[in-house]
Amino acid sequence: MSRKVTKYSAVLAVSLFAAALAGCGSENKEGTVGTGPGGVATVGDSACVQCHSAVTEALTGESLIAQYQKSSPHNTAGLGCESCHGGGAQHNGVGPIPFAQPDASRCADCHDGTTAVATNSDTAFAESRHNIQTIRSGATCRRCHTHEGAVLSNIAGYTGDLATLEDTVNQNKVPLVSSYSQISCATCHEHGGGLRTIKATNGAAGPVVNWDPNNNRTVDQFDLCTSCHNMYSYNGSTLLTNGVPVNGVATGTVGHHETTWYRIIATTHFDNYSTGPQAGAGASGTNAKVEGYVLRRTGANPCFDCHGHEAKTNTRPGRDATIHTDWAKSAHAGGLLTAKYNAVGALTGAAAVNAAMNAYVDDTTAIAWTHYNWDASSRGSCQRCHTATGAANFMSNPAGYDPTGAGNSFSHLQGWSAANGSKQNELLYCWGCHTNAGTGELRNPGAITENYAGVNSTSTGTTGTAVTISYPDIAGSNVCMTCHLGREAGENIKAITDADGILGFVNSHYLAAGGQLFGKTGYEYATRSYAKPTFFAHDKIGTAAAPGTGTNGPCAGCHMTTPNSHSFLPVTKDGTGAVTAITSTACATCHAGAYALTPEALTAEEEEYVASLEALKAALAGKGILFFNAHPYFYRDTNANGIGDPGELVSSNAFTNWAGVYGLALWKDVMGAAFNANLLIHDPGGYAHNRFYVKRLIWDSIDFIYDGVLNNDVTAAIDAQVTATRLDSATATAAKAYLGTTRP
């Protein structure tokens, strides 16, 4: 039996994706003569069916032709049997055929990302948990830990929650076989690559029903994967965990491993609607909770949105890191997996499951994803970077993307409407940046030309024109540039017309690292040069101009050439923030010999960068402009003590009189100094991205705001802040060491 299973497993691995493009294989599935794969003429499906209609799958007894005609994407796409097996003109039932038993590598011949959608099945499955797991043939375990048990259970209806699987009547519905084998391609795929249909039992010893946990009346990927990796009951009505209610949400019990939190999909893939942001237009939802990822359950690839055939996530504590766990602990996921680990700690069993289900991230670590009701139309302009949906839609079609977010649909979020949004929020999921998580294929927005909207306000009589800045094409790093260019640039201030210089602060927004890297987003003072030195090379990393640093541009070249690529961190740090290791391989390519970087040197550089920004903040405070890290960022120092007192740090006390410092003619330069401070405070890696550009911005901002003149008296300006007790001497010394005694 096992030999037959092995034989048909190979045959059934024709395709692992439901999409294939015309042009693969024969010209016509019904036999217009042409040359098929393997260089042999084709004869059409009718000839195949004549002889092979009686051939059955050894394990199930089902007709292979019936399976193919029922579910194969190659049949419905009009490709035909010969698109996988090769031309049949020499076959005639006994002669050769090019690919009698096509395997996963045969699939890859067409599924290369060009002819048809790419698949990582030919390489990834071999090392997957599905392929290397221990065969378990016990009454319950064989349902998901053997090929035969899974396939026969699909037919018998032995699928469902714990009560269903532990019921002996249900167990006895599944025929026994003489031996059991590993999960294979054929466990999930019928002949021709279609997904197997799954039956379930409604409760213990209940009637057999269709397994349809996303309740869309279609056999799809979510049904297949969650038949073992349970998340919902057969009709989607009940969340399956360990049976303990979660913040008022009733749950059932998963089919097995109900006391092992990292085996329960819902501990990481369920975001509790009841704890989400306030619904409604304009709702802020500040400090909403996100407990898990929200799956696009009825989409084409709800599981393959983030997984491929590698089937190895390694969520279990202590396991080797994977791309999935790196991402889940990263800022793009708000550190959600870290929150789960911290909540579980040393707990075990049901207590661990409860802790994991209730663990969440909020504004503390995930402010980019939790602070507002991002999917409501009132936040439409934010959706490009604060939702995976907006990011994916922009990168798929930058020219056609509506910056108001009007084209974004979040129908996979519970209760969503465009006006009110949903009480669930997205993180930056894998599919935000990738078109294919299994192969790693990135979205391709091309070189980013950013349109920084004009600054306009009817209340202050302010008008401004839009500013357009073109950035170079940096391959895969274009994906990063999509959201790391800020919302406003220094040029926006220069493009403003305002009669009295009294207006709200122009906010650069956060983490605009790409703009600093290419020296384009700061407020640049007239008569000063900001051209990069000829030897500056950080903007060339990941290009042909910097051999040995990769091919995906500077963002990926620095942040993703580490053992933990999807942590997006080029260094590791200890609890104090000190750099403990430089893990990016790009650094050592150039910084070698006398220019070699050390963790200690990089820590010192960062500390001096921060000190120079403290000096700039102090100089601004000396003019009555107080910085506080909350919108609108700059406030009036009403008692002139140089300190942001609680009563001063409120939005009604926002600093707006920029002309009041040095007169109407210079108001833009005053705001420019504040703009540069805000821009760089919110780019903590600015010292590494482009140290020449950021030093010049800080130098010129301190130089100007101190006395309204660009006269290079920066050292005196910093010393004056110490004298006025707005800056301590140690910080002043570090700031002067960073900036030097002459303009960088």
UniProtKB/Swiss-Prot annotation:
Residues bound to heme c 3: C107, C110, H111
Range of residues in the leader sequence: 1-23
Membrane protein topology class: Lipid-anchor
Source organism, top-level taxon: Bacteria
Lipidation feature positions (N-palmitoyl cysteine): C24
Primary location group: membrane
One Gene Ontology molecular-function label: metal ion binding
Residues the entry annotates as binding heme c 8: C382, C385, H386
Sequence positions that bind heme c 12: C587, C590, H591
Record: residues binding heme c 7: C303, C306, H307
Ligand binding (heme c 9): C430, C433, H434
Subcellular location: Cell outer membrane
Binding residues annotated for heme c 10, in chain numbering: C480, C483, H484
Lipid-linked residues (S-diacylglycerol cysteine): C24
Positions annotated to bind heme c 5: C185, C188, H189
Binding site for heme c 1: C48, C51, H52
Function of the molecule: Involved in anaerobic respiration with Fe(3+) as terminal electron acceptor. Acts as an electron-transport mediator in the dissimilatory reduction of Fe(3+).
Protein name: C-type polyheme cytochrome OmcB
Originating species: Geobacter sulfurreducens (strain ATCC 51573 / DSM 12127 / PCA)
Organism taxonomic ancestry: Bacteria, Pseudomonadati, Thermodesulfobacteriota, Desulfuromonadia, Geobacterales
